[in-house]
Swiss-Prot record:
Its EC number is 3.5.1.n3. This is Probable 4-deoxy-4-formamido-L-arabinose-phosphoundecaprenol deformylase ArnD. InterPro entries: ArnD, Glyco_hydro/deAcase_b/a-brl, NODB_dom, Polysacc_deacetylase_ArnD. The gene is arnD. Catalyzes the deformylation of 4-deoxy-4-formamido-L-arabinose-phosphoundecaprenol to 4-amino-4-deoxy-L-arabinose-phosphoundecaprenol. The modified arabinose is attached to lipid A and is required for resistance to polymyxin and cationic antimicrobial peptides. PANTHER family: 4-DEOXY-4-FORMAMIDO-L-ARABINOSE-PHOSPHOUNDECAPRENOL DEFORMYLASE ARND-RELATED, GLYCOSYL TRANSFERASE-RELATED.
Amino acid sequence: MTKVGLRIDVDTLRGTREGVPRLLATLHRHGVQASFFFSVGPDNMGRHLWRLIKPRFLWKMLRSNAASLYGWDILLAGTAWPGKNIGNANAGIIRETATYHETGLHAWDHHAWQTHSGHWSIRQLEEDIARGITALEAIIGKPVTCSAAAGWRADGRVVRAKEPFNLRYNSDCRGTTLFRPLLMPGQTGTPQIPVTLPTWDEVIGPAVQAQSFNTWIISRMLQDKGTPVYTIHAEVEGIVHQPLFEDLLVRARDAGITFCPLGELLPASPESLPLGQIVRGHIPGREGWLGCQQAVSAS
């Protein structure tokens, strides 16, 4: 049996309102638990449209047929009007999710984090994280124990900024296996659970067709030599491609794959995890930099 961590990112108002309830119903039908990471502040995702002037982002939008995939309400959110507060508008849905699934913070403002966190100071990072955690805890009525950086925009500064919040783990980068981030010689931070597998929007196109994606990604899960972690998005697999995701759950089960919340991947003694650090890097299919796992020597 292959155990795969299932991470569900919720970036937008529509993803929370429409995608999450459908995902909850789908997961319940198949007896699967996952980790949900919510954006809880304003939905300003439409402000990413200016990035269309960048060839790699434009190609990604065309390759994934973004208008059909996400819908114009997502693509224009926060452009001609102020972005609506996601958490306030969907508190009941978020609370229901936290009743049945591991629930953590994705971002206060997903667009702001993805656009500006790379040059924010440690203090600005801490203030933004605190704002999101405070809002999410007020909604779910219990402490937030995990987080996942929006757009995988993370580096050593983000790792340090999250330390005061005493989280059980973070999932801030792409990599191969769980690790303890090295803060300074002799001092490590909160365990990191990297995403190891590509997302739908990173690979769909000439190389991988939509109808063959499930076969392709299951093959990647079974071949993963580290600790497999797969990310879906409420805006994609919870809305337009919900039938495809349900088919994935069936096929994965038949292939001997069991999905689980990311927290279940942590060992009893996190001190046994290897050391590592998060550095800025790039991966195929995703525009811009993102956090990538890098091994470091124990010496």
